[in-house]
Regions:
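Hydrophobic/aromatic-rich, well-ordered segments within soluble, folded domains that form packed cores
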Residues: 1-18, 153-172, 536, 543-549
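Active-site-proximal beta-strand/loop segments in catalytic clefts of secreted hydrolases
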Residues: 11, 139, 450-452
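Amphipathic alpha-helical core segments of compact helical bundles
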Residues: 316, 320, 324, 477, ...
Length: 630
């Protein structure tokens, strides 16, 4: 029997870990995933009733979801149609002869939801987060991160070979010949090599403040003289922009490697494969399963999701917020909403008091931190209204499933471009209410807690206040802490990139965050080594979350440190496949679940007194090595 003093996570979760079985179609199981599975089961059962015409809500948007779901579930028609629905689009790209043929249709492809290899988007300006601006990013790589392309990376050749094998099998299902497949994949891999040589690694892209490179539009155009950008932006924006924010500077400095006559054969092959990948979910069952083979292998998942579950997941995509709103109204009581709102307000008050008593910040920086905290916007449970564009997602029952999906994509693309040069919409939710998650948005300075996470084991009106604070309390305070993590600290109360620290305070902050980096850096997870720098912002948020939640718990008359720490250890219960855990160690900004418990709790004196942890015990950490930031 593992003692709490030696391995806190295992003492709580070890027995469960030994017997827990990971479903064959999943990479992991545990707290978050189990809750997500419960919700999926409920939604599957409910939407099955709707398909049968039972208990269908009187709602036009959900009525269109049901129609779309019916199209997705018509497996017989999908099998009969085969690849026919995508053939016109494939032909369109195969008939592009020259780079000029392609560039003449850039805007048309963009607005139609067709591939064009242009990584533009609209998001808040870092320097004035109240307005949306144009950003220029970069395409993603085939391998999980640029670090995988190093000559000495142990998985490089293995994964590239795997990608080629799985892609070959997929393309055969689209009736490409062996010669065509070999040619397409070699060209795609060559373009991918070029991308991997210049795009940011996950570690580099995790430092937000270093991603902001503003360019005057005329200067930006010089990166890619072969692209008719004036015509493109006139078509999608109605005018040319005055500036472009570039987060992937190296990519655009090398733009002629991607957008040129020389690169055209590679780009054309990539576009054809993009059309294939765009269509895989909407055609036959064989194609759907083949298309997921590479990602399943990366995560060690032995089986594809069954077709009924996959159909629900696909159908809900364009209607997620509407389904989330239905779920929240069914499952999230007004009493629970009021209680969580109170908890969030309490947590913000605790944070203010902790900041006011902070002994390593000067009053100047401390006051500015409190200003930021005072205007943080909490969103609890569900959005007050659905996005207006959902009314435009009307199913054409005479069109194919694939064509309906493209039509829905056009609605989203039109909406995305319409935000350019407009004020930021603070009412917009980034995830639906039935998703088991939460987030902080540094550009909007808001925290969001969907209804799905506001239940056991994270939160339950029937469990003790200390258990709730160790669960949802720590999650709430974690998201608040993101306002002051290594990324959030660079943004002011309006979400703008601004240095609001004194030089000495920021130096002290960096010193403390370096200690957090050191605590995690080099830790082992299933044979993979944790990168303390990649995970630092999430680890700082965890640390601040525990500190504030623990203090809030202490204010309750029934406070129990044991129940607090125990539930904190329990919510991170997780069992993952070895391949998946190794992948996470390379690419995830979150530390593995076990380390989020075992590396964090020894920073708190209360942990040592509660569990009588002594020097020589596995969980021991000397007082001078403990770190508290917020």
């Amino acid at each position: 029997m593992t003692r709490y003093q030696d391995d806190f996570y295992d003492a709580i979760n070890g027995e469960w870990q030994q017997t827990a079985e990971i479903p064959a179609d999943k990479s992991q199981t545990g707290g978050f995933v189990d809750l997500d599975q419960e919700i999926e089961d409920l939604m599957l059962a409910t939407t099955d009733k709707w398909l049968a015409g039972e208990e269908v809500p009187e709602d036009d948007i959900l009525a269109n979801f049901v129609k779309y779901h019916r199209l997705v579930r018509d497996f017989d028609k999908r099998e009969a149609d085969g690849i026919t629905p995508v053939l016109p689009l494939l032909k369109e790209f195969q008939e592009l002869e020259t780079f000029a043929d392609f560039t003449a249709r850039l805007a048309e492809f963009e607005l139609a939801g067709k591939p064009n290899f242009l990584p533009f988007g609209v998001s808040p300006d870092f320097m004035d987060a109240r307005i949306n601006v144009l950003w220029a990013s970069a395409p993603s790589t085939i391998l999980p991160d640029t670090t995988y392309y190093a000559e000495d990376h142990p998985q490089r050749e293995e994964l590239l070979t795997l990608w080629k094998e799985t892609s070959t099998n997929l393309l055969k299902a689209y009736d490409f010949s062996d010669e065509e497949i070999e040619d397409l994949l070699e060209k795609r891999l060559e373009l991918d090599r070029r991308v991997a040589a210049v795009v940011l690694s996950n570690e580099e892209s995790s430092e937000y403040a270093k991603l902001y490179h503003p360019y005057d539009y005329e200067d930006f155009k010089k990166f890619a003289p072969a692209l008719p950008l004036d015509d493109f932006f006139q078509a999608v924006l109605g005018q040319v922009p005055d500036k472009v924010i570039v987060d992937e500077e190296r990519f655009w400095q090398a733009a002629d490697q991607f957008y040129s006559e020389e690169a055209w054969p590679l780009l054309k092959a990539t576009l054809i494969l993009s059309v294939v990948n765009l269509s895989t979910s909407y055609l036959t069952e064989e194609i759907r399963v083949l298309s997921g083979a590479y990602s399943r292998a990366l995560s060690g998942v032995p089986e594809a999701k069954d077709k009924v579950k996959a159909a629900y997941q696909l159908a809900q995509g364009p209607f997620k917020q509407a389904l989330g709103l239905w779920y929240a109204h069914e499952k999230f009581s007004p009493e629970a909403k009021a209680d969580v709102e109170k908890k969030v307000a309490t947590m913000i008050d605790v944070y203010k008091e902790r900041l006011a008593k902070n002994d390593w910040l000067t009053p100047e920086t401390r006051d500015k931190a409190i200003v930021k905290l005072n205007v943080i916007k909490p969103y609890i449970g569900y959005p007050e209204e659905l996005p207006e564009r959902y009314k435009d997602k009307v199913v054409d029952e005479n069109a194919s499933l694939f064509d309906n999906a493209l039509a829905f994509a056009r609605v989203e693309i039109k909406h995305s471009w319409s935000k350019w040069n407009q004020p930021v919409d603070y009412k917009e939710w980034g995830m639906p209410a039935h998703m088991v998650n939460a987030y902080y948005n540094p550009q909007k300075n808001l925290i969001v807690f969907p209804a799905a996470i506001l239940q056991a084991p994270f939160y339950d009106l029937h469990q003790s206040s200390s258990a709730n604070y160790g669960g949802i309390g720590a999650v709430i305070a974690h998201e608040i802490s993101h306002a002051f993590d290594t990324n959030g600290a660079s943004f002011d109360e309006n979400g703008s990139l601004k240095d609001w620290w004194t030089e000495s305070d920021y130096a002290a902050f960096k010193e403390k965050t370096q200690k957090v980096i050191d605590q995690f850096d080099g830790q082992d997870s299933y044979g993979a080594t944790i990168n303390g720098k990649l995970t630092v912002s999430e680890n700082v948020a965890d640390l601040g979350g525990i500190a504030a939640a623990l203090e809030a718990a202490k204010r309750e008359p029934d406070f129990s440190a044991e129940e607090f720490f125990y539930n904190f250890g329990r919510i991170w219960r997780m069992k993952g496949r070895p391949e998946f855990m190794k992948l996470l160690a390379s690419v995830d900004v979150h530390a593995p679940a076990k380390l989020r418990v075992n590396v964090q709790v020894p920073n708190f004196d209360d942990f040592f007194t509660t569990y009588d942890v002594k020097e020589g015990d596995g969980m021991w950490r000397s007082p001078e090595e403990r770190v508290i930031i917020w």
